């Protein structure tokens, strides 16, 4: 977001497995530069509904807590005029965000991460284990994506701007 910082949204599909850990597949990646927290909240809520998400995990450390303040409030989508309801916080042990709950609240739509050194170490270890066991899948290479896209009529008919926008997630990973 703000102060020259970039906001990243990674959309993962989590597929439960009969045995062992779920398979996590990166579906898409979105990036915004220097957006106001309210604009970020609107963008995240749009993606939440577009992908029928179960949970939005938000980095609530530092400036991230400002984003949370907008996520727990309603917004009107400036493009569609639709109400984007407030998001409830799943791990609100202190009950701080319960006071923002309304009849329209998207219950437990957010999980807040407030990382510290021990959590960072645990997360790093977990991700390394998941990567080495093939439980996390990323997008295909940018060149492979471009070849696949250009082999379709849709891809061939896209102008350069639309093609670049389509390929952006593959470029970023």
Residue ranges of predicted features:
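Generic extreme N-terminus detector
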Residues: 88, 93-99, 105
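Conserved RecA-like P-loop NTPase helicase motor core
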Residues: 106-130
């Amino acid at each position: 977001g703000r102060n020259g910082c970039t906001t990243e949204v990674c959309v993962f599909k989590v597929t439960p497995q009969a045995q062992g850990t779920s398979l996590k597949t990166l579906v898409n990646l979105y990036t915004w530069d220097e957006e106001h927290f309210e604009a970020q909240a609107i963008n995240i809520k749009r993606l939440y509904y577009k992908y029928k998400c179960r949970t939005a995990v938000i980095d609530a450390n530092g400036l991230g807590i400002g984003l949370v303040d907008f996520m727990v409030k309603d917004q009107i989508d400036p493009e569609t005029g639709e109400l984007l309801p407030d998001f409830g916080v799943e791990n609100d042990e202190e009950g701080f965000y319960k006071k923002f709950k309304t009849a329209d609240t998207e219950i437990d739509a957010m999980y807040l991460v407030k990382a510290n050194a021990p959590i960072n170490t645990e997360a790093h270890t977990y991700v390394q284990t998941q990567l080495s066991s093939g439980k996390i899948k990323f997008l295909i290479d940018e060149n492979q994506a471009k070849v696949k896209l250009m082999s379709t009529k849709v891809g061939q008919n896209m102008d350069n701007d639309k093609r670049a926008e389509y390929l952006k997630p593959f470029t970023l990973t």
